[in-house]
């Protein structure tokens, strides 16, 4: 089927089934063919605003003006709003819409006042974007109070503050937020308003209609396939998506989100010389039972989420629904995550024998490439995937965290990442890595890659087994050059014949001791800090490091790059790196190939990367009696709950010290760690006096520990302890000294006060009140560590092993700073 030049409308999804096989859809020679899932809108300028009238029933959420995506009206225009805390009750006595920890947030009143003035219908049009470490939830607004309390229409996947003490937010789609060039707003009556960009004449405006462009619908379980179909020379543009009434969240990498083009049971499908652009979700997804797929020389850009998705996140066994043998070659995948920021350039789930070759993937808010989909060591059919000669760059932009240019999960024997150029990666709070072996990554080879200008390590392994990192160049990472997070009882990785050059930050992280368990092989590497400045090796001298068995054949020397200040990492012929067996490679071949015009498209200038923008939580102010938390749920804003059995820490509806609900902890002899069950809060108190209070009741035999920490590492420890008290065998003690009797089966009231920051004296005051008794005061009790300066962590820990229960109620954490 040959298309003449022109624009063709896709008003509804085109479905191709097995009987539609054996067809090529192509543009005529030299013809510009656009297949659009959108509709053009005509309007006019008035008083500096472009306006148009649309059918009020058409509630679109994307707009493209003169070929560029316009920004839906939002606040703030740059950066984020910080959530100020976790309310326990909806505003104005409204009915709950779910767990308070997933439906209520507080913001500064200045941002909430405009929302509180909206009608109920207008409020539900507002999207509240809540950012977590590696994804974002898109909530609809139910209620807003002038004091800053927000209530959402329903709960989504994750509790607020569950991954970090801060909660980045944006408010989107209300008239008062329309205040910057390039923004637009669609009113309930269909009035569309757009503020032109500087110097812009509005001539071409499109909004989306079709939710998907094409679906290839085979049935691999029945051996029925859509096959031998080619799309060549076609431009697919404009795809719709609408936020559900209850909001939307799709997890890490937006894994469950649909694509504009989707395929199940597809064989021998080719997309060549095509454009896939202006989507609200993912571009293309070869999901279940697909193989022998080719995407070649396609321009995939301006995406709501991901570019290419391969395989299925739920099909973890080999069989008819397993996807394999997908080739993505000489393809540009750029500017994604515009609606769902966790979208990835190219995502391989449970798939095998797939190749990404000579691609340019850049300008995403999360990882460029992700391979594997199991957290741990459970075998899956993910194997023998290859990423080679790809340019992976401009990632993160300080929006999300815990990402890499290439991110891997789980066992995947035969997977190789080679010859790639990874650079310009900046995260929101942590984890802007280059090469990232996350949970359970096993059997992966990384070789001949150039990694530079990342916010965190050029290489990071969370935990994994038997990975090989060889013959790579790591240059000028910002915080840590090479990071290892979690030691285990087998060889984690071999790190050899690599060049590591830096000018700032540490050479090795996460904590120094992780490098001295004998479970990493490190040898024949070259290290250099610019200017010959001294540096340590995980807290050790060069001799101490080598005496442990590391780097016995390695060198400290200038590698003699040709011009690293200009981005030229070619080695000079006399480079000492050759003496360690390093094999020079041509990093310049990474990226797309062919004519200069094609390479020029890939070379888009995205501007300087945003680094080091560390979100800082406002000081925590908590008063939680658990009355707003559902029975059986975890405490809101709490971290570190017992993952294997969340019921070990849960809210119950009986026996409370005050009100009807309290928090129950259940200890026992068979828990994984001695400190379980436990939970903690992240207060972010840096100065002044912190006050913590709680009621506690313990069964006989329950051991209970309350501790404050500064999370700044020491040489031999990952944190610094301050106030620490223990309830054990009917007594309250601190620092090994008994302070008072603490009888079981009654509610005890505890208060802890301490100065932190500049005015600290490394002591705390403690008050214990028994039922019907007078408060017992204990003053100037010493901190467990004199090095504690700030309060990052307040924990409730169960170090015992007896089968017993403990209850907590009315937890208060607050801080005052003298003016």
Where are the predicted features?
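Extracellular polysaccharide-degrading/modifying enzymes targeting complex plant/algal/animal polysaccharides
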Residues: 1-275, 316-320, 550-557, 566-617
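Glycine- and acidic/polar-rich repeat regions and solenoidal domains
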Residues: 13, 241-263, 277, 281-287, ...
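Solvent-exposed strand-to-loop "edge" motifs in beta-rich extracellular domains
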Residues: 236, 527, 628, 685-687, ...
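Carbohydrate-binding surfaces in secreted/extracellular proteins
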Residues: 626, 694, 744, 749-781
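Extracellular glycan-recognition surfaces and repeat-rich motifs
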Residues: 630-664
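Secretory/extracellular carbohydrate-interaction modules
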Residues: 656-729
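Short, aromatic/His-centered strand-loop micro-motif at the edge of beta-sheets
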Residues: 731-751
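Flexible glycan-contacting loops in extracellular carbohydrate-active proteins
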Residues: 776-807
